[in-house]
């Protein structure tokens, strides 16, 4: 039987055409504003109730990016029999951004760049020890999914001693072979003091929101660096701002935030947080762009096609989301 798939998007027809070419003959893709009469699979990141109830044949929702938005989780609570799947096409680009933010923060690239653009060499002589040597330092990676695993491998190659945390370490028996000391989230309280570099690759769920607060930051070594490519609210923004201001943290590289523009008109003047992180010289700011890149959309289409083809073959567990966990 043909799998009927509906993607209610009108933009980027070239990408949809790429997807169409990769689909097997038993997948029928409908896209645009007009839904088909029958729909087995809906592709939408933030579906509304009308979309979820339009077809009595709907079996699955595919979220075409990593993670599950909190608003979508709330909506799906009323659809307990609906399977949910998502994609991890952006794992490489997000991990690369995490490492870039770590290096830029640890090496204080931006303040020195700004000074030399003004022909000012003084910081080189006045602050010669400003850079953190990462080789031999201890890194703590929160989250050991597709992104966290890539981050851990690169950190290991840079000479850091890597500890990572996840809910089910038993599912990753090869972590030790990759040079990663993988621990359970139950052990996290004992690990903050070992985090010269803290890298966050966690989704936002009720269990992770506010996970890194004032107490956790105070237990980290003095002048540690923090990188967040997961979700902003995993870190308490007030505690983070204070730790950066008083020097407890040496710096932070942040790609994910607390406040986003709600429409195109707001994109030129929306503060990303309730605190002025942009005034701090020890912060590297990125506007939630870790998942982007020149080849990422092509990878999205390739992975989406692979998932839809798997669903058409009856592989209903492919990239399935556990909504009780939030990922």
Language model regions located:
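N-terminal glycine-/charge-rich "phosphate-binding" loop or analogous flexible N-terminal tail
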Residues: 1-41, 161
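Alpha-helix C-terminal capping/helix-to-coil transition sites in glycosyltransferase folds
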Residues: 37-38, 57, 193-194, 219-222, ...
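Phosphate/diphosphate ligand-binding glycine-rich loop within oxidoreductases
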Residues: 40-117, 131
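Short glycine-/small-residue-rich Rossmann-like dinucleotide-binding loops
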Residues: 47, 66, 166, 202-204, ...
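Rossmann-fold NAD(P) dinucleotide-binding segment
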Residues: 48-57, 73-75, 207-226
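Oxidoreductase and adenylate-handling cofactor-binding alpha/beta cores
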Residues: 95-114, 156-160, 302-315
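Rossmann-like dinucleotide/phosphate-binding beta-alpha-beta segment
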Residues: 129-222
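Rossmann-like dinucleotide-binding domain for NAD(H)/NADP(H)
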Residues: 223, 230-327
């Amino acid at each position: 039987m043909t799998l009927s798939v509906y993607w209610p998007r009108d933009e980027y027809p070239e990408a949809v055409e790429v997807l169409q070419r990769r689909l097997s003959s038993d997948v029928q893709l409908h896209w645009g504003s007009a839904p088909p009469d029958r729909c087995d699979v809906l592709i939408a990141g933030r579906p509304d109730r009308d979309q979820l109830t339009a077809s009595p044949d709907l079996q699955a929702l595919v979220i075409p990016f990593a993670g599950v938005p909190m608003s979508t989780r709330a909506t799906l609570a009323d659809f307990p029999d609906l399977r949910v799947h998502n994609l991890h096409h952006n794992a490489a680009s997000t991990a690369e951004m995490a490492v870039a933010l770590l290096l830029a923060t640890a090496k204080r690239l931006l303040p020195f760049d700004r000074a030399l653009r003004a022909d000012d060499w003084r910081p080189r002589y006045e602050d010669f020890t400003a850079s953190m040597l990462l080789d031999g330092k201890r890194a703590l990676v929160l989250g050991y999914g597709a992104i966290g695993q890539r981050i851990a491998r690169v950190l290991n190659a840079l000479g850091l001693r890597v500890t990572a945390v996840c809910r089910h370490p038993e599912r990753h028996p090869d972590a030790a072979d990759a040079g990663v000391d993988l621990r359970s989230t139950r052990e996290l309280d004992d690990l903050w003091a070992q985090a010269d570099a803290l890298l966050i690759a966690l989704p936002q769920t009720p269990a992770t929101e506010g996970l890194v607060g004032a107490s956790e930051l105070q237990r980290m070594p003095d002048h540690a660096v923090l990188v967040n490519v997961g979700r902003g609210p995993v870190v308490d923004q007030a505690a983070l701002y204070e730790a950066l201001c008083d020097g407890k943290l040496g710096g932070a590289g942040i790609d994910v935030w607390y406040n986003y523009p709600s429409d195109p008109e707001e994109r030129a003047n929306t503060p990303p947080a309730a605190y002025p992180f942009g005034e701090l010289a020890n912060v590297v700011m990125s506007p939630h762009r870790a998942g982007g890149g020149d080849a990422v959309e092509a990878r999205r289409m390739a992975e989406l096609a692979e998932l839809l083809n798997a669903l058409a073959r009856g592989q209903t567990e492919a990239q399935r989301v556990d909504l009780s966990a939030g990922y």
